């Protein structure tokens, strides 16, 4: 999940592009690793509904309680602490949007509806903004290409691109308010506006060139219903602020918490991949090596890469595994393939080393 932002792929043009392109093009699939990964994890593919529901509901309870405290506490210090807790808990709850794109909805009955009611609509990120988008990122011949809505060659871009990439996420709550309080009503009235809104403003993506197609049939009905309910909430929220029902301070804290969630997610996105591919079609193994695991003993990924996102490379290897199965899958593969295996090459120690790596890469442009 990432906030939409525009960059020009031509910024990546340099002698390093050719080197990276040829390096990725040379990576063949490690069939032994792929077969081992599939064989060792066949019994881990079933999602456990009780884990999903308890995790989501607990995260929401903690997040909204902390948000209410941040809005009501008189002490600035305590309010900031409560706000930080709200950011982390609501970020965890929001991260389940990623699981929604992968699990069979019948396997965790009602979870999509529950997630939208608990977090998607209140935070103005209904699941249709990601469903139908993220699966394209996993398509075998799309990953890392201009057709991938969730990929940019960030490691090959100019140094200024990284602070812009992170900084833009600060405005996410404002952008979402405009999307649902302004653009959604206009789209309902004017078909030409709807065409633009669907294509350009209905996806959580980072590739500015991505243009979304409207779904059909029942999915389109579901999309319109979710959009309408979110729009009503966004308009009602602004109306309550304008009339004093919701204090301005509380509204600003809500926006600040939303910005905090978006920034953490954008930082997590920045280190989810190495971003070293400049448009070439990649093998599954190459995609795995362009992705990142941050396994134990690192502790902080529990906060900044929750709901299985710390095993992002493994997720690209086995996208069907539910998030709660990824730690066990990682342990099995690590034991079976050994310390010197290609599998271990996607494992990294922590956030700061990964950020330093991509910053150094952009400094070479």
Where would I find each of the regions flagged by the language model?
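Membrane-cytosol interface motif
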Residues: 113-119, 279-293
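Transmembrane alpha-helical segments that form the membrane-embedded catalytic/substrate-channel core
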Residues: 87-97, 126-130, 253-282
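Aspartate-rich (DDxxD/NDxxD/DxxxD) Mg2+/diphosphate-binding motifs
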Residues: 95-114, 142-154
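Cytosolic juxtamembrane regulatory segments of multi-pass membrane proteins
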Residues: 205-214, 287-303
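Residue-level signature of the transmembrane alpha-helical core
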Residues: 56, 60, 83-84, 88, ...
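Histidine-centered catalytic micro-motifs
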Residues: 94-103, 130-142, 269-277, 306-321
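Non-catalytic, topology-defining segments of multipass membrane proteins
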Residues: 1-86, 121-251, 323-365
